Each structure stands twice: as C-alpha cells, then as structure tokens.
C-alpha cells in the first residue's frame, strides 16, 4: 500500500490544531521546536507505543520527512491505514515561515 504524503503548503492550509499530528523526532529535537499541537512519540519508541496512535486520520512529521515515513509504514503494517506523511517535515515548515513552539507535550 502506498503511503499518502502531503506538501507543507497543503498541510499548512489544512492545519488547525485539531488535526491529529504526531512528531516522531527524539524528545530533545521536539522540545527545540515543533508544530503547535503535535504530540511527540519518538520513532525509537514507536512500536511499543502504537496503542497511542488514534484510529482517525493521523499526520506524521519529523525533521525532513524520512522518519515520519518510517512511522507511517509501521502503522500500515500494524493495520492503521489512515496515515499521511508531511513531506519536508519540520524543516520545511520553518522554511515556509511557519511558527514552531518550544518545550514539551501539549496539554
């Protein structure tokens, strides 16, 4: 099954903090700047935390789009098929002039 990808421009157009967005970078990367509302589940912990992935459409983001694609593939292999990779990742988000927030998980 092919994994859906969304461009930074299209994602920014759809983004509203109500989307399920998971950032799969490591904790220190996440805390140094992430898309507002993104929940951090590092790829290194991902398989053990699959039960935390919502059953709705979920967007995945990382630094550039590579690790988030791996997370999407893991989800598909586990039967979670409504996953979308944010191509370009957080670097693309920042390059597009979008804001990031610092610190830990959203409340």
What is each PLM-predicted segment?
Residues 1-20, 27-57, 67-107:
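Rhodanese-like catalytic fold shared by cysteine-dependent sulfurtransferases
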Residues 61:
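Short, surface-exposed ligand- or partner-binding patches at beta-edge/loop junctions that are enriched
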């Amino acid at each position: 099954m092919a994994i859906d990808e969304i461009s930074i421009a299209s994602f920014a157009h759809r983004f509203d903090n109500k989307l399920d967005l998971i950032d799969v970078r490591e904790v220190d990367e996440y805390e140094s700047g992430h898309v507002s509302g993104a929940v951090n589940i590092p790829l290194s912990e991902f398989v053990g935390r699959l039960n935390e992935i919502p059953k709705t459409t979920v967007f995945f983001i990382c630094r550039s789009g590579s690790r988030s694609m791996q997370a999407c593939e893991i989800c598909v292999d586990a039967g979670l098929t409504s996953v979308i990779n944010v191509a370009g990742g957080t670097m693309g988000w920042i390059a597009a002039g979008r804001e990031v927030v610092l610190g830990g998980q959203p409340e």
